[in-house]
UniProtKB/Swiss-Prot annotation:
Lineage of the organism: Bacteria, Pseudomonadati, Pseudomonadota, Gammaproteobacteria, Enterobacterales
Its biological purpose: This is one of the proteins that binds to the 5S RNA in the ribosome where it forms part of the central protuberance.
Gene3D superfamilies from the UniProt entry: Ribosomal Protein L25, Chain P (2.40.240.10)
InterPro entries: Rbsml_bL25/Gln-tRNA_synth_N, Ribosomal_bL25/Gln-tRNA_synth, Ribosomal_bL25_short, Ribosomal_L25_dom, Ribosomal_uL5_bac-type
PANTHER family: RIBOSOMAL PROTEIN L25/GLN-TRNA SYNTHETASE, ANTI-CODON-BINDING DOMAIN-CONTAINING PROTEIN, RIBOSOMAL PROTEIN L25_GLN-TRNA SYNTHETASE, ANTI-CODON-BINDING DOMAIN-CONTAINING PROTEIN
GO CC terms of this entry: cytosolic large ribosomal subunit
Assembly and binders: Part of the 50S ribosomal subunit; part of the 5S rRNA/L5/L18/L25 subcomplex. Contacts the 5S rRNA. Binds to the 5S rRNA independently of L5 and L18.
Sequence similarity: Belongs to the bacterial ribosomal protein bL25 family.
SUPFAM superfamilies attached to this UniProt entry: Ribosomal protein L25-like
A UniProt-annotated Pfam family: Ribosomal_L25p
A single BP term in Gene Ontology: translation
Protein name: Large ribosomal subunit protein bL25
Keywords from the UniProt entry: Ribonucleoprotein, Ribosomal protein, RNA-binding, rRNA-binding
Length: 96
């Protein structure tokens, strides 16, 4: 199982997302199963290297947010049109 570390993101919007990407981070969202969505940020290089593996999309992942573990699956990934960059990831809760 892959482990992805994330932090809760308080600010939202295009300008904040751009600032995150300058710091080699990117935004994401965790949602599903009647839970309130959690806005998160992740380290770009860590996730970029993990997503190169095919199992990243097939298996459930462990998302660590403030020492709390969430079992999730990748729902959608937005990538830059011509740069090797991830712009945003949507995760959904996974039932075990």
């Amino acid at each position: 199982m892959f482990i992805v570390k994330a932090e809760i993101r308080d600010k939202k919007g295009k300008s904040f997302s751009r600032k995150l990407r300058i710091e080699d981070k990117f935004p994401g969202v965790l949602y599903g199963f009647n839970n309130t969505p959690i806005s998160i940020t992740m380290d770009h290089n860590l996730v970029f290297n993990l997503q190169k593996k095919e199992d990243f999309y097939k298996e459930t992942l462990c998302l660590l947010i403030k020492e709390k573990k969430y079992t999730v699956k990748v729902h959608a990934i937005q990538r830059h049109a011509f740069k090797m960059k991830i712009l945003h990831i949507d995760f959904i809760y996974a039932k075990i």
